[in-house]
Amino acid sequence: MEPWSFEPKGRFDEHTVESRALRGNPLGDPHERPLWVYVPPGYDDEPGARYPSVYAIQGLTGQLDMWRNRSPFRRNFPELADDLFARGDAPPVIVVWVDCWTSLGGSQFLDSPGTGDYLTYLCDEV
């Protein structure tokens, strides 16, 4: 697959979340964080419809923007998910990609006096 040939059937939106939980964290990392949201095909056609959500979090050394990386001739996860929902092979869901990267070089998904309240951010604010 050529990287320039992907045209999503659903919609990808990029947001910025201002986090109270991460404001003033011990590492001085940003409290404004990127948040990506994918809505499946047909989402805008039924404004009252409700969809389950899936939260995609990367491993310790992963960064949010790494989800867009691809291996040669293979689709990345956002493209695979879009294709799966467009074909109807899975029930439609909203997919949310969350950034919890720290200046220590890894993502955190817990509340810690050393890094900040990432679990609170993830579970209560996102």
Which residues fall in each region the model found?
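Non-catalytic cap/lid and distal C-terminal segments of serine-dependent acyl enzymes
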Residues: M1-E125
